[in-house]
């Protein structure tokens, strides 16, 4: 299955993220996928990448979709904490002193910015022009601000917000293409155990909390979850 994803300003984005996951969940709910044989193993093409997809069916419950992402690539490290903080409407004290921001990609390259705590993440009020400049200079598409201070510390590893002025997204409630790189970075640093599934929290600041499941096993990164239909309509072409 070939999928293409566009932001509200018409920018096409790649990577296996929540947009693709939502498409698979809708196709399953609408009966557009093969109904026989239980769980499904499929493949999707996004922006030239062909990657596995697994649809898990449980009786009486919404399906769960797991998608492989590309192997992680670790890009530019941004050590100018003052510039990053200012672009996010924060001060240097809101960011961690011992870990720099870095661009990481598992299909889409995003700048991962570590904050001291959840309050710092919630305080962010990005300046779109300044943040877009920081992202262009770093070679990143969007910005994933995170802390290791989740709402549910027993079940989650990070609390996050995602901003992407480069493609017209002020803030996103769930971003699988950023959660995958974040867990890849944490796993590479020993911050999460290998071959386990962890939860990344996002969307709380928007009143649309999301819990993104991510599995990291060496070079294999998978994101998954379920979802609900929140709107329906008709598009005339």
Language model feature labels by segment:
Residues 1-16, 20-237:
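Active-site proximal loop and beta-alpha junction motif in alpha/beta enzyme cores
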């Amino acid at each position: 299955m070939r999928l293409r994803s566009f932001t509200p300003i018409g920018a096409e984005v790649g990577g296996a993220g929540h947009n693709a996951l939502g498409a698979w969940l809708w196709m399953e709910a609408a009966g557009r996928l093969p109904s026989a044989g239980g769980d499904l193993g499929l493949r999707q093409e996004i922006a030239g990448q062909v990657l596995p997809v697994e649809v898990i069916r449980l009786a009486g419950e919404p399906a769960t979709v797991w998608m492989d992402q590309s192997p992680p690539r670790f890009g530019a490290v941004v050590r100018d904490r003052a510039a990053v903080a200012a672009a996010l409407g924060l001060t240097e004290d809101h960011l961690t002193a011992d870990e720099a921001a870095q661009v990481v990609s598992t299909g889409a390259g995003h700048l991962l910015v570590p904050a001291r705590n959840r309050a710092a993440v919630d305080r962010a009020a990005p300046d779109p022009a300044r943040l877009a400049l920081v992202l262009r200079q770093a070679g990143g598409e969007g910005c994933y601000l995170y802390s290791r201070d989740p709402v549910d510390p027993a079940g989650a590893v990070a609390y996050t917000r995602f901003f992407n002025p480069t493609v017209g997204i002020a803030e996103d409630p769930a971003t699988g293409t950023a959660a995958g790189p974040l867990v890849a970075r944490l796993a590479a640093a020993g911050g999460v155990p290998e071959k386990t599934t962890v939860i990344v929290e996002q969307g709380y600041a928007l009143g649309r909390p999301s819990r993104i499941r991510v599995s990291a096993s060496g070079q294999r990164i998978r994101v998954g979850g379920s979802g609900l239909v929140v709107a329906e309509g008709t598009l005339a072409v």
